A protein has these predicted regions:
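Conserved ABC transporter NBD signature motif
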Residues: 47-56, 63-65
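Conserved beta-strand-loop-alpha-helix hinge in the C-terminal portion
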Residues: 204-228
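Conserved ABC ATPase "signature" region
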Residues: 101-119
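ABC ATPase nucleotide-binding domains
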Residues: 221-263
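Q-loop/switch helix immediately C-terminal to the Walker
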Residues: 74, 80-95
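A short, surface-exposed alpha-helical micro-motif characterized by mixed small hydrophobic
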Residues: 190-192
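H-loop/switch region of ABC-family ATPase nucleotide-binding domains
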Residues: 183-185
Length: 263
């Protein structure tokens, strides 16, 4: 799902941006939540929204909203006393989703994120942080969304779990054609895993584009108070202090090899 906002008025700001289709989009900056609210159409608006190059009409707004799932930073605490199956079944009831075989739908949603059906009988409160996050992904899949919005969560995981979850998201894009938005203040994470990045400041989009290009603009990021990804900063320092031509890398091993080769 490609989403384009043009001259969209939100919280006294005016925003224009594009959420790219079938990829991981990163959103960061002071007004990052404004972008989420725009995508979710939380307020009446002035401006233009197009979905897959078709202008969104008033009569289509409810249908559009049905195509989006939001994964909050934490699983809803009211479900902590529930078993996984009860939690997922309750979500189907709450959103009034009419499905002939809800158990099959729940199992399919679990297996889509590589969880065994034995999880259905486990209590939510007994799950690890990474297991809870996978359950949240599974909950999102219950409604077959075209767009999944993931709010800040990655700081809770070790590197191995972080990589596993992001590989899973990439597979969901490849196999199911999903579009994903990750909202995060962690530019190291965005640099490593996203393809398209939007940075907000002063109630507008400061810059957007290919992540590797946007987050390598070190001087620009510094001027605007945006945290520079560590891998970018290390390479930038080596380039500037040693006056050598080395490339920016996402893989730490490639970066170290390049620095040692030239410095």
């Amino acid at each position: 799902m490609e989403i384009k906002a043009t001259d969209y008025h939100q919280n006294n700001g005016i925003y224009s941006f594009t959420i790219q289709d079938k990829t991981i989009n990163g959103i960061t900056g002071i007004n990052q939540l404004d972008i989420e609210e725009i995508v979710l159409l939380k307020h009446k608006y002035k401006g233009s929204i197009t979905i897959n190059n078709q202008e969104l009409k008033k009569e289509d707004i409810n249908q559009y909203k049905q195509l989006i799932s939001v994964i909050k930073e934490q699983i809803d605490k009211r479900y902590y006393s529930y078993k996984v199956y009860e939690c997922m079944y309750e979500e189907l009831k709450r959103k009034k989703i009419d499905i002939k075989d809800p158990k099959k739908k729940i199992i399919d949603s679990l297996t889509a994120v590589d969880l065994d059906i034995s999880y259905l009988n486990r209590n939510i409160r007994d799950l690890s942080s990474s297991e809870k996050k996978l359950i949240q992904l599974s909950l999102a899949f219950l409604f077959n969304p075209e767009l999944i919005i993931i709010e800040e969560f990655i700081n809770k995981f070790d590197l191995k779990t972080e990589k596993y979850i992001m590989l899973l998201l990439e597979r969901l894009i490849e196999n199911y054609g999903k579009t994903i938005i990750v909202i995060s203040n962690n530019t190291d994470f965005l640099y490593q895993y996203t393809s398209h990045t939007i940075i907000t400041k002063n109630q507008e989009v400061l810059v957007e584009g290919k992540t590797s290009e946007v987050l390598q603009r070190v001087d620009f990021l510094k001027r605007n108070g945006i945290k520079i990804p560590e891998k970018v900063e290390w390479t930038y320092i080596a380039k500037k202090e040693k006056q050598v031509k080395i490339d920016y890398h996402k893989d730490i091993r490639d970066m170290i090899k390049d620095i040692y080769k030239h410095v």
